[in-house]
């Protein structure tokens, strides 16, 4: 019985130690969430403004034959996959990687995030770059460099489509793994936008098509950076939720173990009293 009580006591200490770690990780994730949410909110207007500008240019010259708008048979796809740099975030990494794995055909992968790079290296996928890009540390400048490489490869015909898999930040409790097509652009101006473009006095120099092509790398950079911001915020929210659940589970386990310990202690005391009484009677 004494050995059993000792084992329970050791297990309680082990769970308490784990609970301290999960609680600390929950607090760290919570402290980083505010800045991550601000990055998400600040990145969205930039992307929306660029998309609006591209739509206006497309509406002003609907006959333009821009390669970024042209749709042809997709023989090869560049897949940008954003995952986390660490684990212990519930199903965050597994969900986005599972979604990316559903992409079939001739695919080249640009992984962002340590877990994404490890996953596709393990599966021997053809990689766009051998550099490991950490999602939490990637800068706006790096996104612009990637965007120029992506648009240059698309323009040269190295791939016919660019898709992006990331985790959209809906709320602290909800994050959704999504896949979007970045290139070619699915841009169909409405009749109202076309009418407004005809009435506007905007002149694009040297031409609307060249201005459109010049903005595309900025647009792709904005999409990638925005997706990184959303993914990082989603990872922190998922980790906070997972660590909160782990902390609560650890607390419940400690309560159960304390109950078992007290019962074992009570049984040991009762046994000792019984033995003393039996010895006195003899």
Region spans (language model):
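C-terminal beta-strand-loop-alpha-helix "lid" module of Rossmann-like NAD(P)-dependent dehydrogenases
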Residues: 1-282
